[in-house]
Regions:
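Conserved AMP-binding/adenylate-forming core of the ANL superfamily
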Residues: 65-66, 79, 83-138, 155-160, ...
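Gly/Ser/Thr-rich phosphate-binding loop
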Residues: 319, 347-350, 361-463, 477
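Conserved C-terminal "lid"/linker of ANL adenylate-forming enzymes
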Residues: 204, 554, 580-586, 594-596, ...
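Conserved ATP/PPi-binding loop(s) of AMP-dependent carboxylate-activating enzymes
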Residues: 455-456, 460, 471-475, 486-523, ...
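Structural core segment of the AMP-binding/adenylate-forming
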Residues: 138, 142-229, 352-353, 615
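Conserved pre-ATP/AMP-binding loop-to-beta segment of ANL
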Residues: 79-81, 205-213, 218-256, 263, ...
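Conserved AMP-binding/adenylation subdomain of ANL enzymes
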Residues: 273-294, 304-348, 361-362, 367
Length: 718
């Protein structure tokens, strides 16, 4: 049997990156075509350290904004829908065609130009999930400037850090955000507090006024401007801005990701590689090829997934993107995703596993998907993509069965693995792998609408493997190595690394921090590999299994155990919906695996009162689980991993697992709480990052930890 076309495409991209990426670059419009795709060179840092470096499409000139909007309008697709905004928190829906979107972008870009924004400037976007945020991003890009999106609602100190790091000429913001059922959250005190705390002062703050809560009397003396008034004035005067192309290696955006020192790292996305790689990814991995296709990425523009697959990816290929202001549950219920898919005939849903867990928790019998799917409302849905954290097999299996019943023919769940640094998925299962194969006939058609019929391979969908994040995608050379950088055999867990160069969507540097880039990603393995910070293994067929962050490895009596592996075993218990494993300090073994579990809705522990219907965090549920449940879980762990992984303890509860806005569980917070509790300190400081979704959850976790360890100490005294 011939290899799958995804395997063929990835192998070609690594063996001959020049021909592979030069061909796919022809699918876009270049203001100046690049003479070559890849340039390799040696970079010498101020410290004297030298390392291998690379650049993509260095002498080309391109406009991402033009490729996302103008070229589709010029091709006669101006009446096609570009953006659908659904906001259940405000009861609003809006639709923008490509022609309408272009008009909005041209005028806002003209406004920004009049406000002093020019090529190379940085502009921070601090906004909720509203169309103005996407329009702002594309208007900034149109001027050749660089946008740096920050989650709307971030605390002033966190925003101040990003202001100091990015040194923006302006901040584009809104009068308020709306967090689920909590109502409007005023942005004014957050933005002004951040500017006051920052040593660097942006010259302008441009405010989108929302009806739900106004930013009254903007302070013009300090550069505050009313967004809608500026646009109205510019439109009345016929002010519009033309496209300003940038070099292939110049920035499109900066996205800040957490750093081990606590200071955010600014990942710089470069124009040429970003556009070429993202267009290919959207077409081949997601099978969103162009007009008529609809992508529903339930993410946030403050996260890399939102940048890539709410904003840029769908628009680069001329498809429709759904912009969603709401939550997976509670706005108004766990059926909102399925109803929106039905309403707009979405072909792809992309979200985080935590969203699916939340929907399962609120709808354990799958009543909502049964209702919508039962009337044929999900027949447009070809795939459910999951990313942001590890997708445990149990959640993948549940939704694979549901998609098989209600989705399009062949609908599948696709787990994919990537990062802010990579810009697009590193691994996954292509849904349109043929689109990645280079045409054997020609690669010369400038806008790239030719037929792609290269080397013949197996084009059937790759087999889903629950617990795996799929196979490597073009441009990413995925390896697993030991701590010395030596490659490991298949099935052996180690450090997941990437060979150089990285794919075009990936970063080649941090914004104005060359030394930090080297020390954070290249130094550990002497510049040979890029350290992803994740641990896992490649199986015999090349599928990647990401088990945990490297810093989530637990050393138990000299055995290195991945928390993700243990969590997977725990989640095979039918009564448990979520599990987080950390290391419990132990004087003999160094650490013992220690679990936080969330029982499924309806679970009634032994020796407890019936569940309350009053809400809250289930105060009837003791922090310490029953001996029966603990024994059953430990049996599963020993059977699936071995006795060395036996749990040293377990805390149960609901609403106690802190997560970031992007859905990642904050294991470090739980680990710090436990490490303090072991010392008898239940009120000690814990470093909670600004990305936390709900700070109150940390207090719930602290209370559960205290209850458990005080009970344990009392038992030890008896």
């Amino acid at each position: 049997m011939p290899p799958h076309t995804q395997v063929i495409a990835t192998a070609h991209s690594l063996a001959d990156p020049e021909s592979f990426w030069s061909y796919h670059a022809t699918k876009l419009h270049w203001h100046r075509k690049p003479s070559r795709a890849l340039t390799r060179h040696t970079k010498t840092l101020p410290s004297g350290v030298s390392h291998e470096h690379w650049s993509w499409f260095a002498d080309g000139e391109i406009s991402t904004s033009y490729n996302c909007v103008d070229r589709h309008v010029l091709a006669g697709h101006g009446d096609n829908v570009a953006i659908i905004w659904e906001s259940p928190v405000t009861g609003s829906t809006e639709t923008y065609t490509y022609a309408q979107l272009l008009d909005e972008i041209e005028v806002l870009a003209g406004v920004l130009r009049e406000e002093g924004i020019k090529k190379g400037d940085v502009v921070i976007i601090y906004m909720p999930m509203i169309p103005a945020a996407l329009i702002a991003s594309l208007a900034i890009t149109r001027l050749g400037a660089i946008h740096a999106a920050v989650f709307g609602g971030f605390a002033p100190q966190s925003l101040a850090q990003r202001i100091e790091a990015a040194r923006p000429r302006a901040i584009l913001t809104a009068s308020c955000g709306i967090e689920g059922s909590k109502g409007p959250i005023a942005y004014r005190p957050l933005v002004e507090g951040a500017i006051n705390a920052s040593k660097f002062k942006p010259s302008k703050v441009i405010i989108w006024q929302r009806d739900q809560l106004r930013w009254n009397h903007p302070d013009k003396r300090n550069g505050q401007r009313n967004w809608q008034r500026l646009v109205k004035s510019a439109r009345g005067r016929g002010i519009k801005a033309a496209t300003v192309p940038v070099k292939g290696t110049e920035g499109v955006y900066i996205i800040y990701t957490s750093g081990t020192t606590g200071l955010p790292k600014g990942v710089l996305r470069e124009a040429g590689g970003h556009a070429v790689g993202l267009a290919l990814s959207t077409k081949t991995l997601f099978n969103i090829k162009g007009p008529g296709d609809v992508m529903f990425c339930a993410s946030d523009i403050g996260w890399v997934v939102g940048h890539s697959y709410i904003l840029y990816g769908p628009l680069l290929v001329g498809a429709t993107t759904i912009l969603y202001e709401g939550k997976p549950v509670g706005t108004p219920d766990a059926g909102i995703f399925w109803r929106l898919i039905e309403k707009h005939k979405a072909n792809v849903l992309f979200t985080a596993p935590t969203a699916m867990r939340a929907m399962r928790k609120d709808d354990p019998e799958n009543a909502f998907i049964e209702e919508v799917g039962g009337r044929g409302g999900l027949r447009s849905l070809r795939a459910l993509f999951l990313a942001g954290e590890r997708s445990e097999p149990s959640i993948v299996n549940v939704y694979q069965k549901l998609l098989g019943r209600f989705g399009a023919d062949g609908a599948t769940v696709v787990d994919n693995w990537w990062s802010s640094e990579s810009g697009s998925p590193i691994t996954g299962l292509m849904q349109n792998s043929r689109g990645a194969i280079i045409s054997s006939s020609s690669s010369s058609d400038a806008e790239g609408e030719g037929h792609e019929q290269g080397q013949v391979g197996d084009e059937k969908s790759l087999a889903l493997r629950p617990g795996s994040a799929g196979l490597p995608l073009p441009g990413f050379d995925v390896r697993v190595v030991d701590d010395e950088g030596n490659e490991l055999s298949s099935g052996t867990m180690g450090n997941i690394v990437l060979g150089l160069p990285l794919a075009p969507t990936a970063f080649t540097n941090l914004f104005m921090e060359d030394e930090r880039f080297y020390h954070g990603y290249l130094k550990r393995f002497d510049g040979r590999w890029v350290d992803t910070g994740d641990s896992g293994m490649l199986d015999g067929d090349g599928y990647l299994h990401v088990m945990s962050r490297s810093d989530d490895i637990i050393n138990v009596a000299a055995h290195r155990l991945g928390t993700g592996t243990i969590e997977q075993a725990i989640l095979s218990h039918p009564a448990i919906s979520e599990a987080v494993v950390i290391g419990l300090p132990d004087p003999v073994k160094g650490h013992l695996p220690f679990a936080f579990i969330q029982p499924k809705t309806g679970y009634i522990p032994e020796k407890s009162t019936p569940p309350s219907t009053a809400g809250g965090h289930d105060s009837h549920l003791p922090a310490k689980p029953s001996e029966k449940l603990f024994t059953e879980v430990n049996t599963l762990v020993r059977e699936q991993i071995g006795a060395i992984a036996s749990l040293g303890g377990m805390i149960q509860g609901r609403g106690m697992l802190p997560k970031t806005r992007s859905g990642k569980t904050l294991r470090r917070v739980l680990r710090e709480l436990v490490e303090l509790a072991v010392k008898g300190d239940y009120e000690g400081f814990v470093n909670v990052p600004p990305t936390v979704e709900d700070g109150d959850v940390v207090d719930v976790a602290r209370g559960r930890v205290r209850e458990y360890f005080e009970g344990r100490a009392e038992k030890a005294r008896l």
